[in-house]
Amino acid sequence: MKALTLALFLALSLYLLPNPAHSRFNPIRLPTTHEPASSETPVLDINGDEVRAGGNYYMVSAIWGAGGGGLRLAHLDMMSKCATDVIVSPNDLDNGDPITITPATADPESTVVMASTYQTFRFNIATNKLCVNNVNWGIQHDSASGQYFLKAGEFVSDNSNQFKIELVDANLNSYKLTYCQFGSDKCYNVGRFHDHMLRTTRLALSNSPFVFVIKPTDV
């Protein structure tokens, strides 16, 4: 009887396990090591000030030393006419490129960026006329590496507004970025991917998040 009970329990446990085949981002379901902040919680910069919707900020690694600096738009794909890759600067003192953060909702009264709510991100940098719209963030699959990279390009709203800023450490005002599948509650960490061939650190969907702080560009 005990053997039968144990077998039934094991079978039920296996049945209840999430099926990674159901996710097109297999196998990196978002870990839930941190409780998400309330949607009523504003995102704060390194000075403790609220991050303003539509404002320009730097997103800089919260880890000093080997952690690198801020996020930059880079031209890694020589087949592309525009820079489309998001990288972590190897220089701790480099804040990266200015980034505009805007709530995905079209509420004109949304003046503050709130944690755990959908946001759109775009690089606010000078480009040539051909690449002027290739600054919006989105996730794109790379068949060669099998990774889902954070890219900049002419992404439609269904792709570019699926990001959330989640609180990691309230004492440090540090955060992580998550990407949620459109029409689904499945979310994934955006973390580092060390591209040894190109000798750079890129951002991609990952089990381990890229933890960052937000700096105003006028600092």
From Swiss-Prot:
Localization annotation: Vacuole
CDD domains attached to this UniProt entry: beta-trefoil_STI_SPOR (cd23368)
Signal peptide residues on this chain, from the entry's feature table: 1-23
Pfam families in the record: Kunitz_legume (PF00197)
Keyword terms: Signal, Storage protein, Vacuole
Alphabetical list of InterPro entries matching this protein: Kunitz_inhibitor_STI-like_sf (IPR011065), Prot_inh_Kunz-lg (IPR002160)
Cellular component GO terms, alphabetical: vacuole
Record field: transmembrane: none
GO molecular function: endopeptidase inhibitor activity; nutrient reservoir activity
Tissue and organ expression note: Accumulates specifically in tuberous roots and tubers upon tuberization. Sporamin accounts 60 to 80% of the total soluble protein of the organ.
Protein family membership: Belongs to the protease inhibitor I3 (leguminous Kunitz-type inhibitor) family.
Physiological role: Major tuberous root protein.
Name of the protein in its database record: Sporamin A
Organism: Ipomoea batatas
